[in-house]
Amino acid sequence: MNSITWGTTPWGQPVPLHAAWHLLWWALALGFGILVVHAVWKALQKPGPAAPPAPPALAACVPARVPRHSLPARLFHWFMAACMLTLLLSAFLPKAGVLFPWVGVHYAAGLLLIFAIAFHIVHAVFFMDFRSIWPTGADLAGFGQGEDAPVAARPGKYPLANKLYHLAIVVVGLTMVVTGGLMLSRIRTPFFTRNPYLFGDAAWGGIYLLHGLAGISLVALVIVHIYFAARPDEQPIARAMVTGSMDREFVLTHHDPAKWGCEPAETK
């Protein structure tokens, strides 16, 4: 099965048109497949020994509620989620036969997402701990050691799974907004003059293809994200995106406070 739908120019040259429709089913299968495999693995996993306690000097600097997400970061998360879900529904429902004036809805949600991501980049780079969300060699060394891992082997603010998911969303999200922004030049909007000749046929085909692949990939990512957010053992992390903070006990048993910026009193 061809993963790319091809067309031809008036001169008989083959050009890509968009990602093949059947790839959406592969994305759904991948998302639900990861869900099932992980759920079965966790169900069969035997309880391990209790997590070793953090050193008293280190535990003493951890407050009852540990700040994790600022209000702007939380607002961006939920606003981005609303935009992305709107984009997915307005992209795939018409293809499934649910017809409505989707073009205006789609490009409006896309523009809002572009502005939101631009805000988040500035906010993350200049007002947040920008490096804490990116995977490092230390994350790989401590990955998979379980809850009974020594404190020094535990993650800091973000576990490796969170960092890898964020990296995937960055790649998919930026691909969507860059290609989508270029595609806006092909339709009539109140913001700029329509110019379908900004690129040649082959370039437009590549842009549409990348946009479609990003949208299809987002389907699998959304399924995985909702699944992990709904898991009982992930509730402290999920609730932090609403409340902005995490319980002290969860931090002490699942994270290394020192990597989270906690400095014992004796070292200050």
Predicted segments, located by residue:
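Membrane-embedded alpha-helical bundles that constitute the cytochrome b-like, heme-associated redox core
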Residues: M1-K268
